[in-house]
């Protein structure tokens, strides 16, 4: 219920979210292997436009659980992990979805910086990319353009200081 969350935010509460298994379709942002990696990035843009200040990444390393794995019959492909084991080197390897998640976090922080410079422009820009978790642009060029515009806005604010 969006009104409930808006009321809580108006009362001064912070709003966090996370993705875990659902929704598992192509019309909602998530981080499944079957979705474009940019969806994982856009989650953070939708967090920004929704006033969400925290994101819990569920399942960093559940690659050994078949339900969340990469097998064709896995129900939630990739939801349980964004890294892969590198047992030979006792390390982990980042996935494309993990890198996209990192880029999304960086974008979120840049949006917050831009908000301090020009809140109207920052929110308008974010809305060109992800208005909600189910209303977003899947166009890579639009996302790239928004990122470049965001960087320019932050740079403009830096020069004015």
Identify the function of each model-found stretch.
Residues 52, 67-161:
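Catalytic domains of carbohydrate-active enzymes that cleave complex glycans
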Residues 1-66:
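Catalytic-core regions of glycoside hydrolase
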